[in-house]
Amino acid sequence: MSRIGKKPIAIPNNVKVSLDGNVLTIEGPKGKLSMPVHEIVNVKIDNNQITVSKNQESPFAQAMHGTTAALIKNTIEGVSKGYSVTLEVVGLGYKAAMKGQELELNLGYSHPIYYKPPAGIKLEVKENKITVSGIDKQLVGQVAAEIIKFRKPDPYKGKGIRYEGQVLKLKPGKSAGKGKK
């Protein structure tokens, strides 16, 4: 049995959970999310708790047991508190700004890059820091990764877009001609 799946998931007072067939709908103060539940897993709602159990004993059932429990926990946290990721734009002349609903990035290319976030994602820019926020943890992480992909951190100078607080191990530059004969 999965360690994560064994523990019952507490439902906060401000969150409503309903199960319709194989679709679990979770609604909270920040919004509403629905997620499919695999038929190999049973979800039971009672006494402000959700319990997840598996139908059969197989490695796949065990994996889905833990995964489903973790996804439900993340969804409950998302609709009650929300998720956010902060990115830093580092580099001389590298800039980020919001133009209406689109994110405009100047990253040393000959043209600016425009990024329109998907529905449910909010972008904010303050002093070359981009904050990606939303209620879906997977979507917030995916959008942050897509923005980083426009200019990954350079391994020599550290220029580019990175997660806030991310420590880069910089490579040494060329050391040709120093002491060699």
UniProtKB/Swiss-Prot annotation:
GO molecular function, one term: rRNA binding
A Pfam family the protein falls into: Ribosomal_L6
Keyword Kinase tagged: no
Entry's Gene Ontology cellular component terms: cytosolic large ribosomal subunit
Database matches in InterPro entries: Ribosomal_uL6-like (IPR000702), Ribosomal_uL6-like_a/b-dom_sf (IPR036789), Ribosomal_uL6_a/b-dom (IPR020040), Ribosomal_uL6_bac-type (IPR019906), Ribosomal_uL6_CS (IPR002358)
Keywords, in A-Z order: Ribonucleoprotein, Ribosomal protein, RNA-binding, rRNA-binding
Domain of life: Bacteria
HAMAP family: Ribosomal_uL6_B
PANTHER family attached to this UniProt entry: 60S/50S RIBOSOMAL PROTEIN L6/L9 (PTHR11655), LARGE RIBOSOMAL SUBUNIT PROTEIN UL6M (PTHR11655:SF14)
Family the entry assigns: Belongs to the universal ribosomal protein uL6 family.
Role description: This protein binds to the 23S rRNA, and is important in its secondary structure. It is located near the subunit interface in the base of the L7/L12 stalk, and near the tRNA binding site of the peptidyltransferase center.
Quaternary structure and partners: Part of the 50S ribosomal subunit.
Protein name from the UniProt record: Large ribosomal subunit protein uL6
Record organism: Hydrogenobaculum sp. (strain Y04AAS1)
